[in-house]
Each structure stands twice: as structure tokens, then as C-alpha cells.
A protein has these predicted regions:
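Active-site helix-to-loop segments that bind/position phosphate- or nucleotide-bearing substrates
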Residues: 2-89
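Internal, well-folded beta-alpha domain core
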Residues: 86-233, 237-241
């Protein structure tokens, strides 16, 4: 069983530092494509000031030189969903569960185990980079598929941006969860609350040591419970009354 979550733009560079892993050839190819930009071009590419682009340029150079500080992916990414995952003071058993079952999807490093060491960077699949003449999604598709190859159970807590990197054959095997609130008899999806609920789902799965996705249906997560009457085979609805 694999649980897929997306990377985040917000980063916590106060996280613990770990030993760097060798960069994959794909990651090097992307970094070299970014390195080819002038400072002005990089600022335009990212949609940021040249002052901030200089920070990114320094990060790119440090990564290629092997001198960048690296942090566990699960602890470096710090968006709302990540802040809603229990990450501090975990037992060895809890960390082992996350390392075995949780995969983090990124545009620079591909698909990562929870505690893989990575460096701060700025890149997502909406950016118009063409490593090896391909879009970022096309560039990573084969590696993304290989990351879950042979897995019978795949739970996607991904946004469509990241999910679409996988081939159609893999996407058709994924189970997705939607978190909906009952507001006066109308079911609504709230982006912020959904992000928090996805983080709470990761925590609940870790605490309960879930390895069979069917067992999710008996969980209550941040006030959300499974609704069989609203769910489909591959789309499970959790409702907060």
C-alpha cells in the first residue's frame, strides 16, 4: 500500500539536517536546464524579483555542487497539509510506517520516501520548463509510474497537478478521498479544511497502522466519517456533519 501526497511551496529550513543523497540523472538534467537561465530569465520564469531569483540561483548552484543543506522531505515541506501531519516526537515504529508507505511527489526529485534528504528548491509542474525537450510532466511520467509499480493499493491525496503526471493506467487504479462538509443540508468542499483533513488522514493512518485501505472506512478523521451512500468504487467521500 502506498499513500501519495504532493510537495508544498512553503519550506521549513529549521528542520533537522540529514546526509544528502546522490542526485538522480533526471534531477541533474532539470537543474542544468535551470542553471542555463540568466538571472533576469530566472526571475521571469519564477515570476519573482531578481533579488529573490538570486537566492534560487544560489540554491541551484549549491545542489549541483553537492554543497546544499538537505532535510527530510516530510519535515522540509511545510504547507498547511504538512503542518496538519503529526511529525514531531514520533516513535521508531511510526517513522518506519511513514518511510514504508508514504510517498511525496515532487517536480525536482520525482517520487520520494518520506524521509529522503532533499534541499530547498522552487519548482512545480505548472512551470514551463522543458528538460530534455519534454514538459516536466512527460519528463517524470515513467519514473512516477515505476514508484508505484506492483502496488495493489494506491491512495491518492494529490492535487490534479501531481496526479496527472502518472499514466492513465496508474490513475485508474488510485483511490481518491474527498472531504465534504454538510452545511445546512448542502455538501461543500472547502480547500483549507480539505488540506488539514488530508494531513489528519496521514496521521490517522500512521497511528492505526493502516495497510489495507478498506480499513480507512471505519476511521473518523478530524470529524470526517466515510459515507458509503455518496462514495464510488475509486472515490471515497468523507463527510463532516
Amino acid at each position: 500500500m502506498k499513500l501519495l501526497i504532493p510537495s508544498a511551496k512553503e519550506l521549513n529550513e529549521q528542520a533537522r539536517i540529514v546526509e544528502p543523497q546522490p542526485l538522480s540523472e533526471n534531477t541533474k538534467t532539470i537543474l542544468q536546464a535551470l542553471r542555463a537561465f540568466s538571472l533576469e530569465e530566472l526571475a521571469t520564469f519564477y515570476g519573482i524579483s531578481e533579488e529573490r531569483a538570486l537566492v534560487e540561483k544560489e540554491r541551484i548552484e549549491a545542489l549541483l555542487a553537492g554543497s546544499a543543506k538537505t532535510y527530510p522531505a516530510l519535515e522540509l515541506f511545510d504547507g498547511l497539509m504538512y503542518r496538519s501531519i503529526e511529525r514531531q516526537d514520533l516513535s521508531e515504529k511510526e517513522q518506519a510506517y511513514l518511510q514504508e508507505h508514504l510517498l511525496i511527489t515532487t517536480a525536482l526529485y520525482g517520487v520520494l520516501p518520506a524521509y529522503e534528504g532533499i534541499a530547498p528548491h522552487r519548482l512545480d509542474f505548472m512551470m514551463k520548463l522543458k528538460p530534455a525537450g519534454k514538459s516536466l510532466k512527460a519528463f517524470w511520467k515513467e519514473d512516477y509510474d515505476q514508484a508505484v509499480e506492483g502496488e495493489e493499493q494506491i491512495l491518492s491525496l494529490l492535487s490534479s497537478e501531481f496526479e496527472q503526471v502518472f499514466s492513465k493506467a496508474i490513475r485508474e487504479r488510485m483511490i481518491r478521498i474527498k472531504f465534504m462538509e454538510n452545511r445546512g443540508g448542502t455538501l461543500k468542499i472547502h480547500s483549507t479544511i480539505s488540506k488539514k483533513a488530508r494531513g489528519a488522514m496521514v496521521t490517522a493512518m500512521m497511528k492505526e497502522e493502516i495497510t489495507h485501505l478498506e480499513d480507512l472506512k471505519s476511521l473518523e478523521v478530524a470529524g470526517f466519517s466515510y459515507r458509503e451512500d455518496l462514495s464510488q468504487e475509486k472515490e471515497w467521500i468523507f463527510v463532516k456533519e
